[in-house]
Amino acid sequence: MKSRRQNVSVARQTILGRDENFEPIPIDLVIEIFSRSPVKSIARCRCVSKLWASILRLPYFTELYLTKSCARPRLLFACQKHRELFFFSTPQPHNPNESSSPLAASFHMKIPFDGRFNIISPIGGLVFVRYEQILKGRKTPEFVSAICNPSTGQSLTLPKPKTRKRIWGTSHFGYDPIEKQFKVLSMNIGDGVYKEHYVLTLGTENLSWRRIECSIPHVHGSKGICINGVLYYRAKADMFSGTLMIVCFDVRFEKFSYIKILKPTTTLISYNGKLASLVWEGPSYICGKRFEMWVLGDPEKHEWLKHTYELRPRWQNVLGEDLLIFAGMTGTNEIVLSPKYPSHPFYVFYYNLERNTIRRVEIQGMGAFKVNEDYIFLDHVEDVKLI
């Protein structure tokens, strides 16, 4: 990393001005200053000079910024207004003892669409989006797949897999922490099950799909979650079967396996680095006075550990009359609940498993937008790496 260690004396006029009394600033110090700057400041600094732009593109800097961002995760919101999808984020409160002051949402980017859209669970600072769009020369909308980075405002349209199947099933987004690779898994339907499975690896010179084999007949049933390099998603044996399972896809080795589940699951979450399932006694929204969390013990033996949580009656004063759904779980083991029918003012709720306490946090700055309850994501990080 010789270029990182050199001094900026050759470009002092760009960084320090023309005053010869100043000593040149080491690149390491410049990088450290930038790593503490807000993500929007990074975008502006890229336009100041070629030297600054080159510094902010160094792999060392982007990795350093990402590492620091992981220590301050954010809530990511996808909001719909007319035919545009807007991305906002707020700091994610991680200290159960801190006061629940209102949080101001920051706008990042928007995506136009012409029909339906679907957001696959984001990973790190990247978001995988599928949306309908009327392409040039066409009269009807077609689905487009894209990888977006809300922090930089960039998006990358993915090529379509070459397949004869007309009925496309679903897609998932995974990350291999060993090889540090993002991968997209896509499947299409034939005879009631997924017949063809394709993988695309991001970061390669030529983006292309590779067909892989899967020996487990299944059809998709829920959004997935990637934990420690394994992508999990709920599925059925076929479109007409009531047999449920959780399919496991090893992102690095691109191999499939499955886990039996004892109860229908509402939300898959990560609990202390393990797969867990939140189960409510009733519909998909929260009702009643208790819920269960099933934590995967031994995946090879299909063993689950059951935890039951009782809701205190006085919580009704905090929750109000809203119907709530599970949005996920934070790294500090707080379950995040969001309204099924968002209103103004807009709140999210944090339930602490260890303390058996709940707090309400107001989110400001999105009043003019429709917040879709299915598109509130936890542990989003700001990534300044350009796509």
Curated annotation (Swiss-Prot):
The keyword Cell inner membrane does not apply. This is F-box protein DOR. Keywords: Abscisic acid signaling pathway, Ubl conjugation pathway. PANTHER family: BNAA05G37150D PROTEIN-RELATED, F-BOX PROTEIN DOR. Component of SCF(ASK-cullin-F-box) E3 ubiquitin ligase complexes, which may mediate the ubiquitination and subsequent proteasomal degradation of target proteins. Negative regulator of guard cell abscisic acid (ABA) signaling, especially during drought stress. Induction: Repressed by ABA. Pathway: Protein modification; protein ubiquitination. InterPro entries: F-box-assoc_dom_typ3, F-box-assoc_interact_dom, F-box-like_dom_sf, F-box_dom. Part of a SCF (ASK-cullin-F-box) protein ligase complex. Interacts with ASK14 and CUL1. The F-box is necessary for the interaction with ASK proteins. Strongly expressed in guard cells. Mostly represented in seedlings, leaves and flowers, and, to a lower extent, in roots and siliques. CDD domains: F-box_AtFBW1-like (cd22157). Residues 19-64 form the F-box domain. Disruption phenotype: Hypersensitive ABA response of stomatal closing and substantial increase of drought tolerance. Transmembrane segments: none annotated. NCBIfam families: F_box_assoc_1. One of its GO terms (biological process) is negative regulation of abscisic acid-activated signaling pathway.
